[in-house]
Regions:
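Conserved, well-structured core domains of diverse proteins
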Residues: 1-232, 421-426, 432, 436-440, ...
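Conserved, mostly hydrophobic/aromatic
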Residues: 157, 257, 290, 298, ...
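Glycine-rich beta-to-alpha transition loops that act as phosphate-gripper elements at the mouths
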Residues: 276-282, 341-354
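Long, distal/terminal scaffolding or interaction modules
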Residues: 425, 436-442, 451-454, 473-706
Length: 706
């Protein structure tokens, strides 16, 4: 929608404004004070200098923004190749931090306490959970990355015993489950390749709310990057451009987020669920909401975190630094008594172990590296990732010099010349050694003990322009939440029926029954994600003799209207019948199977309802679905392969002059948005704004001129 200019005010923020200016602008302002920050005098001086340039009194010079990585990437690559010591690289990075500080952490130094105990760096324990280090390889997707680079990141994480997060581009089929304990799979707005097998192939599942480099924007993979292999992993059509919506269309509130987290944990009860949020104004409150929604991990991604494929305006003007995100999230979670319930991860332009220690002091449990991992396999920071002409073979699907010559590349170096898991291994091992040295200097023998100890940092430069005293204050610890009368309150799990169905099916399969019908006449709106747990158990091999299972029919009758997520992530051999209707998220990310939502007989013998809620078949890659009634907004959004029939009929001539087009249609608006493949048959009014952003698939519309 369109707003007046002031309608966008909540999206703006500032860093380092003096209090007088900040009060007038009225935006959230970080690290400014009465005594320090941008003043009217400084603004006047800047205006006078610009005026002098404009008049020609002095020579005008166009100021280029300072860029950090282009100045050090060669040194990082040399470390990966074993041609330079980490200390030499780290010292050079520190010199540039002093010359052109481009991040808040560049204004901070690590300050050991006078009474710090002596610790040998080799005695410092870096382990977090089942992994050996508090650093991870940040999410990068297949498609944006070429196959060789993409595989290399996963192999390196396994060698290092750390986590490699996957981007939103699905997974190469031969990699599914191969790196389970070292892998995180991403569920983003496009839902590319997200299905029950995908969700059960990793120990971490990340819901991507946004990206630090471009919060509020969706992704775009050009058609020339969608090869047959990329299309297979994403469940789409080769050569067709892929567009991610700007937001997840089943997430409009914290309650919706809680529902999706619940669905993912139903699909894979063994996985930890992370929620990735860009650093924006109010990030602390957002983090508290995410924790209350049931996430295990919160990832704050700063404005330098992201991709060379982001648009220039986003790279330059959008988002906030990672330091602000992790600082506010950590403090807000402590104030709410929720900090111990979640891990806090952060990424965004990290380059050294010193960066990691600073972010941990601000509140992070783990710190992500994305660009540095790319540099370790040969990236030259040319910022042409979206062009498909990467001259070092990282973000292109061209693998040989001959192929590059045929396609007119100006230069090309095959990936294998510099890229290997050993390069990343060398760099990340050097980072961990760096972390050990700094943690030992601070007097700790466990890296997690420095988490949130911001008083171990001190501001060392730009004291007049920015006030970091709030950032480096000790954080008051809260002694848990006040005790509740009657002890801890617990309630009925929303997905308990979904789990009971699995138990019943397993019991009868054990008796040699390989085709079953589970009938339930009492399901209600609070019974959510029905069929999801069963499909996950089948995929994990937890149902005995599951390869002999012919079909499992789930029948919900007697005016049943199951709760959200009916048949979410469904696959063969499961079929679902609901007589009455269903709520939001039916059949989302289905890979196969059948879902029939039918009308039900009322006491007068008339058949009524048979409708579904919002985001029906969101991201569905397969399966056959029939809806005898109507569908709420965004039916079949981002669908890529399923077959769907909507049976709701037009019963009287349409009157567009009455307004409310969506409310009076059979499909309530935005149907088939961003669809890439699949087929749909609409027997009634398809509603307004259909097929926006659609790049493939077929929609058949019944024509009724009368």
């Amino acid at each position: 929608g369109c707003h007046e200019l002031r309608g966008y005010g909540h999206s703006f923020s500032s860093i380092g404004l003096g209090k007088a200016i900040a009060n007038i602008l009225g935006t959230p302002n970080y690290f400014g004070s009465e005594a320090r920050g941008l003043t009217w005098t400084a603004i006047l001086q800047d205006a006078e200098e610009r005026a002098a340039e404009f008049r020609g009194d002095v020579r005008a010079r166009l100021q280029n923004p300072d860029r950090f990585f282009p100045k050090v990437w060669k040194r990082a690559e040399a470390v990966a190749q074993g041609e330079l010591t980490w200390q030499e690289y780290s010292d050079e990075v520190r010199e540039w931090e002093e010359k052109i500080p481009v991040s808040i952490r560049h204004l901070l130094d690590i300050k050991p306490r006078p009474d710090a105990k002596l610790v040998d760096p080799s005695d410092v324990d870096l382990r977090v959970g089942n992994h050996d280090m508090p650093i991870i390889i940040s999410a990068m997707s297949y498609g944006s990355q070429g196959e060789l680079a993409y595989r290399t990141y996963a192999d390196a994480a396994k060698m290092l015993n750390t986590v490699c997060m996957n981007g939103e581009g699905g997974e190469l089929l031969d990699m599914l489950g191969k790196y389970k304990q070292w892998r995180g799979q991403q569920v983003a707005s496009g839902r590319f390749g997200v299905n029950i097998g995908f969700l059960n192939s990793a120990d971490f599942i990340e819901i991507k709310i946004g990206q630090g480099a471009k919060p509020g924007e969706g992704g775009h993979l050009p058609g020339f990057k969608v090869t047959e292999q990329v299309a297979a992993s994403r469940g789409t059509t080769p050569g067709v451009a892929l567009i991610s919506p700007s937001n997840n269309h089943d997430l409009y509130s914290i309650e919706d987020l809680a529902q999706l987290i619940d669905e993912l944990k139903t699909a894979n009860p063994h996985a930890k669920v992370s929620v990735k949020i860009p650093v924006v104004p109010g990030v602390g409150i957002i983090a508290v909401g995410v924790a209350k929604a049931g996430a295990d991990i919160i990832t704050c991604t700063g404005y330098t975190g992201g991709t060379g494929a982001a648009r220039a305006h986003a790279l330059r003007h959008v988002g906030l630094p990672a330091e602000i995100g992790v600082w506010l999230a950590h403090r807000s979670l402590i104030a709410s008594g929720l900090r111990d319930d979640v891990e806090l991860w952060v990424d965004g332009g990290m380059k050294t172990g010193r960066d990691v220690v600073k972010m941990m002091c601000l509140g992070a449990n783990r710190v992500g590296f994305g660009t540095l991992a790319m540099v370790a396999v040969g990236c030259t920071i040319c910022r042409g990732c979206q062009d498909g002409t990467c001259h070092v073979g990282i973000t292109t699907h061209v693998k040989t010099k001959e192929e590059a010559d045929r396609k007119g590349f100006k230069a090309f170096r095959p990936f294998e010349e510099k890229g290997s898991p050993h390069g990343i291994y060398n760099v990340f091992c050097a980072v961990t050694d760096d972390i050990r040295k700094w943690v030992a200097k601070l007097g700790y023998d466990n890296a997690q003990d420095i988490v949130g100890k911001a008083d171990l940092l001190e501001q060392i430069s730009m004291h007049d322009q920015i006030d970091l005293s709030d950032l480096t204050k000790p954080i008051p610890q809260r002694d848990g939440m006040p005790a509740q009368r009657g002890g801890l309150r617990i309630s009925r799990p929303r997905n308990i029926i979904s789990r009971q169905i699995t138990e019943e099916v397993a019991r009868y399969v054990n008796k040699g029954e390989y085709e079953l019908t589970y009938d339930d006449e009492q399901v209600m709106a609070h019974d959510r994600a029905l069929g999801t747990h069963l499909c996950g158990a089948i995929k994990r091999g937890e149902i005995p003799d599951n390869e002999r299972l012919d079909a499992v029919h789930l029948s919900f009758s007697n005016s049943a209207v199951p709760g959200n997520g009916l048949g979410a992530f469904i696959d063969e051999p499961v079929t679902i019948l609901a007589e009455g209707g269903a709520q939001d998220g039916v059949g989302k990310c289905a890979k196969g199977g059948t879902i029939n939502i039918l009308k039900v007989l009322n006491h007068n013998g008339a058949r009524l309802d048979g409708s579904v809620g919002k985001s029906f078949a969101y991201g569905a890659q397969g399966g056959f679905f029939i809806v005898q009634g109507d569908a709420d907004t965004r039916a079949c959004i981002r669908m890529s392969g399923a077959d769907v029939i909507f049976g709701g009929m037009i019963h009287e001539p349409l009157r567009d002059d009455l307004g409310g087009l969506g409310a009076r249609a059979n499909l309530k608006g935005y149907a088939f948005e961003y669809m890439t493949s699949g087929r749909a048959l609409v027997l009634g009014d398809p509603g307004p704004w259909i097929c926006a952003g659609m790049t493939g698939g077929t929609v058949y519309q019944r024509v009724q001129p009368e």
